[in-house]
């Protein structure tokens, strides 16, 4: 009788252990499934954050270039490569540091994709006068083609336009004064074209 009870207890114990083991396996499976889902969710969030950071980094990398470009356009309106040029009323001007003849000065300006200055307004005359005080500078004015017919380098004449000749000029003294320069007083004077003086180049504002 005691042996039968013992045998029944053993069977009950074994059955309970199996059921408990199955429950433990199911719990482990659920935990693994939840862990996998959580890992997938975290990976998705991480990838999204990485993508957002990459986008922000690209923006930050491009911003300095834009900022530098904006800064350069404010500091050097005539272009970062034209820092020796001066801006005035929508155009750029170069005041030379060396002296040469009128024709050489004209060629120098053309090499810099510009031309000898054309003074066609009182405002521009004042700008040049202030900038060239006590020195002589070539301007883009000559009567080499026809004596007394003064023309700017762009082909326009001075008969109906602004002029600022010094009193008594142009006088063609010596019969070969065919090029004009700004006198030390800021007024214009005719002189022979081989005379060496400074010069002013002019060009449009870069687009």
UniProtKB/Swiss-Prot annotation:
Role summary = Hepatic lectin is a membrane receptor protein that recognizes and binds exposed N-acetylglucosamine moieties of plasma glycoproteins, thus mediating their clearance (from the circulation) and endocytosis.
GO CC terms for this protein? external side of plasma membrane
Membrane topology label: Single-pass type II membrane protein
Keyword match Transmembrane helix: yes
PTM remark: Some or all of the cysteines are involved in disulfide bonds.
Q: Which residues form each disulfide bond in the chain?
A: 78-92, 109-201, 179-193
Signal peptide location = none
**GO process annotations (BP):** endocytosis; immune response
Q: In terms of domain of life, where is this protein from?
A: Eukaryota
Bilayer-crossing regions: 24-48
Enumerate the SUPFAM superfamilies for this protein. Answer: C-type lectin-like
- Ranges of residues in domain C-type lectin: 77-203
Note the InterPro entries from the entry: C-type_lectin-like (IPR001304), C-type_lectin-like/link_sf (IPR016186), C-type_lectin/snaclec_domain (IPR050111), C-type_lectin_CS (IPR018378), CD209-like_CTLD (IPR033989), CTDL_fold (IPR016187)
**What is the name listed in the Swiss-Prot or TrEMBL entry for this protein?**
Hepatic lectin
Residues in compartment: Extracellular: 49-207
This chain is glycosylated at 67
In its UniProt record, a GO molecular function of this protein is: pattern recognition receptor activity
Q: Which coarse location class applies to the principal site listed for this UniProt protein?
A: membrane
Q: Give the sites modified to N-acetylmethionine.
A: 1
Annotated source species: Gallus gallus
The protein's location, in the record's own words, is: Membrane
Q: Which loops or segments lie on the Cytoplasmic side of the membrane, by the record?
A: 1-23
Name the keywords, alphabetized. Answer: Acetylation, Disulfide bond, Endocytosis, Glycoprotein, Lectin, Membrane, Receptor, Signal-anchor, Transmembrane, Transmembrane helix
């Amino acid at each position: 009788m005691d042996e039968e009870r013992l045998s029944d207890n053993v069977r009950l114990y074994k059955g309970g252990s199996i059921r408990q083991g199955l429950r433990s396996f199911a719990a482990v499976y659920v935990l693994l499934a939840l862990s996998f889902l959580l890992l997938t969710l975290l990976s998705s969030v991480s990838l999204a954050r990485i993508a957002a950071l990459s986008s922000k980094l690209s923006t930050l990398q491009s911003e300095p270039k834009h900022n530098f470009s904006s800064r350069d356009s404010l500091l050097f309106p005539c272009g970062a490569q034209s820092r020796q040029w001066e801006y005035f009323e929508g155009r750029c001007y170069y005041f030379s540091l060396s002296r040469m003849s009128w024709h050489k000065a004209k060629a120098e300006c053309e090499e810099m994709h510009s031309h000898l200055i054309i003074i066609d307004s009182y405002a521009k005359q004042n700008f040049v006068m202030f900038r060239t005080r006590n020195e002589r500078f070539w301007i883009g004015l000559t009567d080499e083609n026809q004596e007394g017919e003064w023309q700017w380098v762009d082909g326009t004449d001075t008969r109906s336009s602004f002029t600022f000749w010094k009193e008594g000029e142009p006088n063609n003294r010596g019969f070969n004064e065919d090029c004009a320069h700004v006198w030390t007083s800021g007024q214009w004077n005719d002189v022979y074209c081989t005379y060496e003086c400074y010069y002013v180049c002019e060009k449009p504002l870069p687009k």
